[in-house]
């Protein structure tokens, strides 16, 4: 059974493409660029105290956006309630945020304090999370946008931000899946726990293919 077959058999689950994070995306000027807003992708971040995670993309009026905010399923994060903001051209929103906005932009804010977290079991990595924000709508204007994750209380904590619904994997993504699974499980602090069978199968097949491809190159 190939990794592709495993992904097809579990097609009802989310299979976000992993986006590497060098932890430098703390301002609009240093925002992580999203090149395809429709592709299902996720970035993990150990948000520092009083810090933000900034992502940016270009869009046209009417373009759809789907975005999520979540935190790892860890006891110490049970009451952690970070927020998400969409920053963009005038008309994006009229909310205030606890950080400086780029000139000529406005913000729409998604707070989570009054929202009920949704438990999420991610079968490919064998990790669990609480989803705090899940929003889908059409963008109001042409221009540059930012997705910003932040903590209104100014505390640090682990979180992830995801966007897009279209699931697509390239061959190099499959070769790297075993490394992604390792990194994601470490972020969720379950790296020392036994992997579920599906996670183990995907990780093992990816590792074997990676080794074989290395030797035939």
Where are each of the predicted segments found?
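Extended low-complexity, serine/threonine- and proline-enriched intrinsically disordered segments
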Residues: 80-109
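Sec/Tat signal peptide C-region and signal peptidase I cleavage site
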Residues: 11-15
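Short loop/turn segments at connectors of secondary-structure elements within structured domains
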Residues: 9, 61, 76-80, 141, ...
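Bacterial N-terminal signal peptides
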Residues: 1-8
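Hydrophobic beta-strand segments within beta-rich accessory/binding domains
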Residues: 54-76, 144-152
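Extended, solvent-exposed segments with strong compositional bias
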Residues: 43, 103-138
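C-terminal edge strands of extracellular/lumenal beta-sandwich accessory domains
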Residues: 16-28, 55, 82-93, 124-217
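N-terminal edge beta-strand
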Residues: 34-52
């Amino acid at each position: 059974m190939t990794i592709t077959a495993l992904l097809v058999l579990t097609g009802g689950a989310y299979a976000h493409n992993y986006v590497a994070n060098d932890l430098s995306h703390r301002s609009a000027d240093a925002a992580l660029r999203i090149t395809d807003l429709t592709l299902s992708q996720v970035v993990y971040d150990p948000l520092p105290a009083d810090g933000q995670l900034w992502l940016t993309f270009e869009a046209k009026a009417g373009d759809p956006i789907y975005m999520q905010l979540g935190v790892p399923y860890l006891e110490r994060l049970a009451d952690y309630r970070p927020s998400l903001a969409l920053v963009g051209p005038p008309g994006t929103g009229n909310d205030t945020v606890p950080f400086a906005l780029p000139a000529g932009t406005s913000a729409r804010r998604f707070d989570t304090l009054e929202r009920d977290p949704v438990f999420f079991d991610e079968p490919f990595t064998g990790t669990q999370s609480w989803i705090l924000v899940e929003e889908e709508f059409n963008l109001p204007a042409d221009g540059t946008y930012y997705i910003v994750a932040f903590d209104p209380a100014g505390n640090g904590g682990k979180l992830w931000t995801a966007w897009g619904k279209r699931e697509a994997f390239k061959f190099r993504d499959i070769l790297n899946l075993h490394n992604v699974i390792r990194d994601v499980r470490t972020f969720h602090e379950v790296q020392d726990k036994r992997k579920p069978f599906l996670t183990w199968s995907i990780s093992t097949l990816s590792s074997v293919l990676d080794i074989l491809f290395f030797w035939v190159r």
